[in-house]
Every structure is written in C-alpha cells, then in structure tokens.
Regions:
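Active-site histidine-anchored catalytic micro-motif
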Residues: 1-116
Length: 116
C-alpha cells in the first residue's frame, strides 16, 4: 500500500546560507532522508507549499486539506513546520477514512545533526 508524503516546507526543508543570514525553503528532502534510511516502502512525494509554518494562511490550510481529500492514498504523511502544526492538524480533524500523520523537525534535514 503506497503512502503519500505531502510537503509544506518548514524547518525540514530550510536552507541557511550562513550563521547570520536569512533562510529559504528548498526542495523537499524527504526522498533523500528515506533513501539514506534504506526505506523500501512504496511512497510518492508531492510538494504542496514551501513555507515556514508561521506564514501558512487559512487559505493555504484549505489547499493542504484539499490535497489530502483528493489523495488516492489512504495513508498520508505531511511534513510541516512545528510552530503551527497543531493548527493544521485541527483543520484536518474532520477528514475521514484517511490516516494522516504530521511531522516536523527542529533542525533542517540538510544539517549534519538533524532530527528530520
């Protein structure tokens, strides 16, 4: 059974250019993380947003919800920034017949010591 991984940005995919600079949200890192962990499960990755979760609007939560509802997979992982993950989870609570897991990171996946 295939798992859908929907990415929204957050710390998971942040890129810092140096210790004093701003960041950007890069391409999703989840495939390389799973490859590095020798994960052999069937999955597909879909990038929905590339934002810090503090910048996600209610309209964008609607986009996330629509993507979840339209997803053919019943098992869905959403990578999301930790600051507003709870708000998005509450927004998705009425989606039925799908198992939805939101996950985030405190350190970007591109860092050597990451929790992504």
């Amino acid at each position: 059974m295939r798992i859908a991984i929907l990415t929204t940005g957050g710390t998971f995919d942040k890129i810092y250019f140096d210790a004093n600079s701003e960041y950007s949200i890069g391409e999703p890192c989840i495939s390389s993380i799973l490859d590095e962990g020798n994960v052999m499960s069937d999955y597909r990755v879909q990038s929905i947003l590339k934002k810090d979760s503090l910048d996600i609007t209610q309209d964008e939560r609607e986009i996330i919800k629509k993507s979840v509802i339209e997803c053919e997979e019943e098992r869905i992982i959403i990578t999301h920034g930790t600051d507003t993950m709870v708000e998005t989870a509450k927004f998705l609570e009425d989606v039925k017949e799908k198992t939805i897991v939101l996950t985030g990171a405190m350190q970007p996946a591109r860092f050597k010591k990451t929790d992504a």
